[in-house]
């Protein structure tokens, strides 16, 4: 019986060592770090719009020449749903939003916009327009802005002098 007891003891010891080897658990924590960034984008315009000298009668008769500027929207990564809006610095527009007030009585500017893939279209101020939709592009969108001096509706243009105005260009994207 002693031999049987010794044999059972040896078997139990071996089994307990085997179970503890199989049942051992080790854990290690793995650090995870992430930096989430919104793509950085820049809006570039190639020049200011300078009409120099314009005759009052050319503005009143709609014969004044338009001037244009190129716009580029560059991002360090692809962005979607790019929208653009032109906001007059004077915050005044005609009732149909097609003419911005210059800040000088009777003088305004009409606006046309062209995406790189299309021709010019008359557009309103203070309204968002789609710049990208299903168009394929590689982190760069191009467009053109065209302004023309015109009579501001409901006001008489009779005063001469230098005029400085601004347009704020707002671009929104996802």
UniProtKB/Swiss-Prot annotation:
Disulfide bond sites: 41-75
Main location: other
Location(s), subcellular: Fimbrium
Signal listed as a keyword: yes
Species in which this protein is naturally found: Escherichia coli
Primary role: Involved in the biosynthesis of K99 fimbriae.
This protein's UniProt keywords: Disulfide bond, Fimbrium, Plasmid, Signal
GO-annotated biological processes: cell adhesion
GO cellular component labels: pilus
Signal sequence annotation: 1-21
SUPFAM superfamilies: Bacterial adhesins (SSF49401)
Residue spans crossing the bilayer: none
InterPro entries with a match to the protein in the record: Adhesion_dom_fimbrial_sf (IPR036937), Adhesion_dom_sf (IPR008966), Spore_coat_U/FanG (IPR007893)
Residues flagged as site, Required for stability and transport: 173
Disulfide bond listed as a keyword: yes
Name of the protein in its database record: Protein FanG
Pfam families, sorted: SCPU (PF05229)
């Amino acid at each position: 019986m002693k031999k049987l007891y010794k044999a059972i003891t040896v078997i139990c010891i071996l089994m307990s060592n085997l179970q503890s080897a199989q049942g051992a658990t080790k854990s290690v924590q793995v650090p995870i770090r992430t930096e989430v960034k919104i793509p950085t984008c820049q809006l570039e315009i190639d020049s200011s719009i300078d009409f120099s000298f314009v005759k009052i009668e050319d503005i009143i008769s709609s014969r004044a020449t338009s001037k244009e500027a190129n716009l580029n929207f560059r991002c360090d990564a692809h962005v979607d749903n790019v929208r653009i809006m032109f906001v007059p610095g004077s915050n005044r527009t005609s009732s149909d939003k097609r003419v911005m007030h210059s800040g000088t009585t009777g003088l305004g500017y009409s606006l046309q916009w062209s995406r790189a893939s299309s021709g010019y279209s008359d557009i309103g101020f203070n309204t968002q327009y789609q710049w990208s939709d299903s168009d394929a592009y590689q982190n760069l969108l191009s467009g053109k802005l065209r302004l023309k001096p015109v009579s501001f509706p409901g006001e008489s243009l009779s005063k001469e002098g230098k005029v400085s105005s601004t347009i704020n260009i707002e671009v929104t994207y996802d």
